[in-house]
Amino acid sequence: MSSKKNRKRQKEGAEGASPSLSAAPSRSGTSTPFAQPSPAAPGMLVVTNFLEKVDGKVPKTFQNSLVHLGLNTMKSANICIGRPVLLTSLDGKQEVYTAWPVAGFPGGKVGLSEMAQKNVGVRAGETIQVQPLLGAVLQAQEMDLALSDKDKEINEEELTGCILRKLDGKIVLPGNFLYCTFYGRLCKLQVLQVKGTDGTTLGKLQSASGTDAQGMASEHSSMESSDVDLSFQLSQLDLKEPQSPSSQSTPCKPTNDRTVNKAGEVLLDVTQSPRDGSGLGLEESTGLKCSFDSSKEGNTQPVSEEKLLKPASAGTKSNTDTFYFISSTTRINLRKICTNSKEQDSQFKVTYDMIGGLNSQLKAIREIIELPLKQPELFKSYGIPAPRGLLLYGPPGTGKTMIARAVANEVGAYVSVINGPEIISKFYGETEARLRQIFAEATLRHPSIIFIDELDALCPKREGAQSEVEKRVVASLLTLMDGIGSEGSEGRVLVLGATNRPQALDAALRRPGRFDKEIEIGIPNAQDRLDILQKLLRRVPHLLTKAELLRLANNAHGYVGADLKALCNEAGLHALRRVLRKQPNLPDSKVAGMVKITLNDFLQGMNDIRPSAMREVAIDVPNVSWSDIGGLENIKLKLKQAVEWPLKHPKSFNRMGIQPPKGVLLYGPPGCSKTMIAKALANESGLNFLAIKGPELMNKYVGESERAVREIFRKARAVAPSIIFFDELDALAVERGSSSGAGNVADRVLAQLLTEMDGIEQLKNVTVLAATNRPDRIDKALMRPGRIDRIIYVPLPDAATRREILNLQFHSMPISNEVDLDELVLQTDTYSGAEIIAVCKEAALLALEENIKADCIMKRHFTQALSIVTPRIPESLRRFYEDYQEKSGLHTV
């Protein structure tokens, strides 16, 4: 049978049908096939891009394993539909794919997907050899795969099962890449060695020499050594490197560096000698090895990822050789690759020293976590059950995940990370099985910590669950946490959870015995922000003094740790732009030494980086200062007392035993600068400013208006210290019983507003500032002390205030010397501030109307403007405010 096959191969080689069987003259006078195809060999096709959506009948999962060919091309190459074909590039890289016909596909071309082009090492327009597989295709009994270090946390048993399921029937060669989606994560593996059911082993022998320029492992050729005598092999072995493919000569198969290993037989490896690269080296080790001196046992040496995860370029297989495919009975051996990133990992390893502003929380966390893990016997001796779980909760960006990473690095325990959304599977029972396996592995490798990030996504409240999967996951996690310690690992396994929505967690999860302790990681205060900034700038070149850092920390109201880190990055970019603007052509080495961050860089960065909680309610604070408002000095003082003093002098308030005012109401006639005062307060105080217009909160759906009020106060607490400004409060806080709307929406909104301002939940570092011109319509419950402590009447401007308002306007307008300021002050009696500004604008327009090129405003223009703009607040309204003030006894200024 073998003689017939040999005669057939010689006949095909004589006809030039197969490039891999083409004869070449050798030193011994025998003919041997080429190791690599020549560009002019038969079967060479031009690579083109894969055609998408050609055949809807082909499942999407199989499309990446196909190559597209024209019908005529398949006929001429004797390729059958749906049969495997061997792709061989000019560099010797090989892959096996399935041939698939495409109607109208151009002749002489082959369509490859992007992944196939990458694996074989070709691009569109290059040539590649396509041959049908004529040799036997047997099952692979065993296969060694290289697993990247980045996938080291993956469970090997489950990954092996996933590979056998998804790659069943895949024909593999040493050096090929395999891609497998594991729980939504794409894993890339490389075939190191394949052992068939016939005992033949195809493998890759790794070079341990660091001087290899390519840094790649050699592939071993496949040869039938069962019928070949060792002495015959040695007598025919050529120890000189062939000069060209045409002069290559060996008595074995042409692929010079693949190994064949049959059980109980001699191992023969042929590679280049590391000494001079001009010959072949021999080494004897329990048989005969021809390999590098340093590569004794390729599998016992840690192999770098750069050397493994590259396709082999040397050595090819003939299409008449024996090939092996993956089956359900194939045994998979996963070998992890050591990477060179250990130094980088240690450089960026998170430690306790890198966390700022959380000293008290870190102390409590270390007591809860480190003591049970390091001294479990101490708890047993006193009969104290060790805590099983610790829950960290707080707003996003405060450092919950960073604390967990620091704990994992500092404690030295085995850490298993569960990202809630990642392990959720659509298949029944798969999510619970994954959870059980993680807990079982942590128990075996104790002391260990199981960190569950975004716990609310994994364990929401069961009564509000969208599907049965969520309920089963919650029940499974409850059972697993109750079972911690049942195998004798009491106190040696701890679950650390993190969430920013603790109210969304299932109540059963938060009871003692599961998550025993809950620690809030809140928004940092000024002192904590200073600590965070100092640790962030520890390794950053800057010119900030301690006083400037303190000022920066005091101004960064509502910034969390993530915001401060983003602020430092933005300040660094500002500093870099400043240097490059002056000297744009500087080399990188000189720029690095010149860039130093200043306080001005941080102040500019704060204009771009706002607190995270303020981004959804971002408001451009108007550039209005106290100096832009004429007069009203007493009102300015009262507002500073209510807003700025509690922040700048908190010890004075504590010493006096008083609480800062919670609310300030400004009321008075329209146009008397009530809203402008609020703008100036927002700008001058530097606090986070939330401007709310009363009618915007009203919603026709039941409960939505109250929810909007509740959400406003929640955001204000999150970015405290902050100011909530309610303009036109009379539209929102209407006196109860006066509303005629359906469902009494106004009454419910008012009740929610009263509860938020002075309810069970304390309103800390949040000041409510309101403005209205109808104080008589506001409910009396809102006007009492404890809710609105300061009620300030803003009357029409007096003579001194009108003088300041006119002076401010004259600074920006060209006024003629004939204009008498005192006379204007007298003429604008009973005018509001807005009407005085309107008089000035009208006079300017009259001057332009008279002469478009006018360069100043004359007295006659003001006289005419005063006749056009008249006081619009009647005497009755002024008397109303005065009577209301006297009857209600409200505090006035």
From Swiss-Prot:
One of the protein's GO biological processes: brain development
InterPro entries (alphabetical): AAA+_ATPase (IPR003593), AAA_ATPase_domain (IPR050168), AAA_lid_3 (IPR041569), Asp_de-COase-like_dom_sf (IPR009010), ATPase_AAA_core (IPR003959), ATPase_AAA_CS (IPR003960), P-loop_NTPase (IPR027417)
Residues that coordinate or bind ATP 1: 394-401
Activity regulation text: AFG2A alone display limited ATPase activity and is not regulated by RNA or DNA binding. In the context of 55LCC heterohexameric ATPase complex, the ATPase activity increases and is stimulated by DNA binding and inhibited in presence of RNA.
One GO term describing the cellular component: cytosol
Crosslink position(s): Glycyl lysine isopeptide (Lys-Gly) (interchain with G-Cter in SUMO2): 859
Region (Disordered), start-end ranges: 1-38, 202-227, 239-315
Tissues where the protein occurs: Expressed in testis; with localization to spermatogonia and early spermatocytes in the basal compartment of the seminiferous tubules (at early stages of spermatogenesis). Very weak signals observed in spleen and skin.
UniProt key word Methyltransferase: no
Keyword hit for Nucleotidyltransferase: no
Modified residue annotations for Phosphoserine: 273, 278
PANTHER family (alphabetical): AAA-FAMILY ATPASE, ATPASE FAMILY GENE 2 PROTEIN HOMOLOG A
Domain notes: The first ATP-binding region binds ATP with low affinity whereas the second ATP-binding region binds ATP with high affinity.
Quaternary structure annotation from Swiss-Prot or TrEMBL: Part of the 55LCC heterohexameric ATPase complex composed at least of AIRIM, AFG2A, AFG2B and CINP. Associates with pre-60S ribosomal particles.
Name of the protein this chain belongs to: ATPase family gene 2 protein homolog A
Name of the gene encoding the protein in the UniProt record: Afg2a
